[in-house]
Amino acid sequence: MYHPRVQGVRVGQTLEVRNSDATLHNIHSLSTKGSGFNVGQPLAGMVYKYQLKAEEVMLHVKCDVHSWMTGYLGVVPHPYFAVTDAAGTFTIANVPAGKQTVQVWHEQYGALAQTVDVKAGGTTTVEFAYTGNEKPSQTAFAVQELVVPVDATAVQLIASRRRD
């Protein structure tokens, strides 16, 4: 399994994927920004390193050998991102004051965005709610994490997932 399944990273960081078992795997990124790769890892302990060169929300990574092995990377050019906890909440610290766009992403329901006015030295709270009317993504898996890239003092954000 890719662990964590959903994570945020910065443009320029190096992704490191390790095969922890004695089974053939491959790492196949389904990039829409030209940052794709498809590399086999036939042996336990093999490590593949790749520098993430372009912003992409979300970069889907999967194993073609094992269809249940899939993960997502929110690749952004700044440090303002988080993955929600089990309750669907997260905090992003030190966001610059002013108008900022906050975007959340869910594997099944896609992206939602809001513009917020961040006050210097204050806390801003934002709530997102997926209604179930959003266009479902191509995958049938539902996950508990949301990736929250903020474009550009503490910001506390609350993301609500649709409850079935």
Residue ranges, per PLM feature:
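Extracytoplasmic copper-binding redox domains, predominantly the cupredoxin/blue-copper superfamily
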Residues: 1-164
